[in-house]
Amino acid sequence: MFYPFIRKALFQLDPERAHEFTFRQLHRISGTPLIGLLRQSVPSKPVSCMGLSFKNPLGLAAGLDKDGECIDALGAMGFGSIEVGTVTPRPQPGNEKPRLFRIVEAEGLINRMGFNNLGVDNLVENVKKSHFGGILGINIGKNKDTPVEQGKDDYLMCMDKVYSYAGYIAVNISSPNTPGLRTLQYGEALDDLLAAIKTKQAELQQKHARYVPVAVKIAPDLSHEELVQIADSLVRHQIDGVIATNTTLDRSLVNGLNHCAQSGGLSGRPLQLKSTEIIRQLSAELQGRLPIIGVGGIDSVIAAREKMQAGASLVQIYSGFIFKGPGLVKEIVNHI
């Protein structure tokens, strides 16, 4: 109800400053009775996916709470799952500012954040303090200064540290803002990474006597042939799920709008159709052999339903949450 007024004030600020201000307030009320102000009552709509029981099909996508600072505050809003990160082995500042831009007319965002985060050890400490009752996903990536050829070592190091605390682990190989990262989506590089991840997963399962599923997050900027190859690799390596999709480099729907020429990944409404089409193609290729988590431009009940009709078992929001506020969570969970 009040979000349009809050949004109006926040949108007067630079996008990253607005984000930092909001997170400071959320962090401040976490663990206090004031968290009740954020609590939304949503119906239970259980979904079984990747061997896990989600209390409802709506999740928060990675990138909003990179360091796991506000898990409980965000959880109070009714999400069935929250994906924190992307986190890297070592802290890194990310790219130079400004690096986040609103395309207000299109309800889109362009970001070139560059995996800015305080490192995996810091994230684990924050996760330990949280009390979220839903499924917590931890999204992992590689440090910018780690050569792509050695990138798998970063993923394995993160897996080692987050395994005990994650409901599932998301492997981010599709951000456009870390040089060379998307090359890990193809051919031998992908097979090599997935084989190493499955070996590490088996080793950690034995060590912790608990199986934590692994999902791979892919880009929307893939040809049909590339998508077929990726689907084949995911099935062959028995990956537990696929998150489709990350942000796009395509600007065709925002041409001529303010900030459209900024480099980085575009998310929000302009990504909606593109990501849904990837999900549709992926679903046709996978034939139910592994589940799809649909993300990209979901800003309404209809957009969420479209993702699920295209083949997604679960859906996630991020940009729509920025533009529509917490009410979107309740609306989607109530009607999906």
Curated annotation (Swiss-Prot):
GO biological processes: 'de novo' pyrimidine nucleobase biosynthetic process; 'de novo' UMP biosynthetic process
Catalytic activity, as annotated: (S)-dihydroorotate + a quinone = orotate + a quinol
Binding note for cofactor: Binds 1 FMN per subunit.
Cell compartments where the protein resides: Cell membrane
Keyword set includes Ligase: no
Membrane topology: Peripheral membrane protein
Highest taxon of source: Bacteria
Amino acids binding substrate: K66, N111, R112, M113, G114, F115, N172, N177, N246, T247
Subunit structure, as described in the record: Monomer.
Protein name (record): Dihydroorotate dehydrogenase (quinone)
Species of origin: Edwardsiella ictaluri (strain 93-146)
